[in-house]
A protein has these predicted regions:
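C-terminal motif of bacterial Sec signal peptides marking the signal peptidase cleavage site
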Residues: 7-11
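Acidic/polar, low-complexity intrinsically disordered N-terminal segments immediately downstream
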Residues: 12-103, 284-328
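Auxiliary, metal-adjacent structural segments of Zn-dependent hydrolase domains
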Residues: 85-136
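Active-site recognition of the HExxH zinc-binding catalytic motif
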Residues: 143-190
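Metalloprotease/metallohydrolase-associated module, dominated by Zn2+-dependent proteases
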Residues: 195-328
Length: 328
């Protein structure tokens, strides 16, 4: 009976509005109630995403559809501070406004759940995908490199580190909702090898580094420019770049799986201009140029001009960077 129920839930379309049962040990999930913030209701009605900002018990947060986080259930979490709610609504609205409603309703997680802290001590997760249905974000976010919130309305466009991490997580959650990988996209590059080629390059790098340091024992690893000029570093970077060009990947790690490959393409497309993508990724790789055409066409089938979103992001981010004092 349980196996049949799991299979049923796994195959449900997002728009079927799943309600987990007590028998599965999962807290019931509902849509926003009639007294919810109008902005929360609007995002739910338009995109099928419920922006949540409060939990009454840890199980309500750490138990999702067919997924639970036992570690944080033990370590604990803190509710979002009430005065931060407008900020997370701004962030959510900005993100969702860059996605077509059809695509979000078909593939996005059911919930964005914002908290002050998720986990404790060594088990803190600034951005956490809980299964394919709940994306948990700490706010203010402590992802390494994330910036303080100074302009809540435009923070989505200003904190590229946080936004990159969010889109990577969303990419994995989207893939989990697909019936199968995008066949044409996969065929456009080299077959995934579970990271074998990429890890081989890493192993060679370690050996080359060890040999170089034996010959240069007084080298200063704190000088970033000097480190990047070392022959073993240049060799490694060139080898990874070649792996990516030949395979149609954005990063070396993308060679592991469709999930990683799709997630990196998604993140790039929704945050970068066509001009920069063409210059940095397409002009030097036939495989990437082909995969670009296939994946952008795929998104357009759901009414999503993802490149337009990327063009906008680059424009807004550059505007923000230009406004900063020199040196920032």
């Amino acid at each position: 009976m349980l196996t049949a129920l799991v299979l049923f839930l796994s195959g449900c379309d997002k728009e079927n509005k799943l309600s987990p049962t007590e028998d599965l040990g999962i807290v019931d999930m509902f849509s926003p109630d009639e007294n919810a913030d109008p902005r929360v209701k609007a995002m739910y009605n338009d995109y099928g995403v419920w922006v949540r900002t409060y939990f009454s018990s840890i199980d309500e947060l750490t138990n999702s559809i067919l997924a639970e986080d036992a570690i944080v259930a033990m370590r604990g979490a803190e509710n979002l501070e009430e005065e931060k709610i407008p900020e997370v609504l701004n962030y959510s609205e900005a993100l969702l406004s860059n996605v077509s409603k059809e695509y979000a309703n078909s593939f996005f997680p059911l919930e964005f759940f914002y908290v002050k802290q998720y986990g404790a001590l060594y088990w803190i997760y600034p951005v956490k995908a809980l299964g394919r249905s709940r994306l948990i974000l700490m706010w203010p976010n402590t992802t390494d490199g994330a910036i303080p919130v100074t302009d809540p309305v435009n923070h989505y466009y200003q904190d590229s580190v946080l936004t990159s991490e969010v889109w990577r997580k969303l990419g994995s959650m989207i893939v989990a909702r697909m019936e199968e990988p995008l066949k044409e996209f996969v065929a456009g590059g080299k077959a995934y090898d579970d990271g074998e080629a990429y890890e081989k390059l890493g192993n060679e790098y370690d050996k080359d580094e060890e040999a170089w340091k034996e010959e240069n024992p007084d080298a200063d690893d704190e000088d970033e420019d000097e480190v990047n000029s070392r022959p073993y570093v240049i060799k490694y970077k060139n080898a990874v770049a070649e792996l990516c060009r030949n395979g149609g990947y954005i990063t070396g790690g993308s060679s592991r799986s469709f999930e990683g490959d799709f997630s990196e393409w998604l993140r790039l497309l929704v945050m970068e201009s066509y001009e920069n993508i063409k210059k940095d990724y397409l002009d030097n790789s036939k495989s990437r140029a082909l995969k670009y055409e296939i994946i952008t066409k795929y998104f357009k089938e759901y009414g999503w001009d993802i490149q337009a979103a990327g063009n906008k992001y680059r424009t807004e981010f550059d505007k923000y960077k230009a406004s900063l004092p020199d040196g920032d």
